Amino acid sequence: MKIIDPYKRVEFLENALFEDIGYHKFIPYIQLHEFEALLLANPEILLMEYVTAHNQIEKLKEIVVNYDNNPEKVNTGNTTAPSKRIIALIPEYEGNKVSVGSVLAGIEGIEVQKGRCKHFADWINKIQNISEQSV
């Protein structure tokens, strides 16, 4: 069975993980495509590290718009994954994506990512609901 819709595919995998682990407090999360989708929720954050990349940031924003303005959908192949698109426009990102990407994504907090990345937001909301129930 091949699941075409990326959201349904990830949901299927997360449900399988949940059932396999079998622990009610385990909340699986598989990032839709890759971490850099969260950076594409607000590409302008990349300007904090790449201060002269204004034109490249505008191109990244256009890419997201072309995917229904949904950063989680930006991926149609090995060369078009979010990180590959960032690297194509900002080659310096390749050498420091692990350190820069995680720091930049965390600077704004998660509200921007939650607002633009449905799958990510659903997972965070599950965690927050459990946390609120525990209080």
Label for each model-derived stretch:
Residues 1-135:
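C-terminal accessory helical subdomains adjacent to catalytic cores in phosphodiester-
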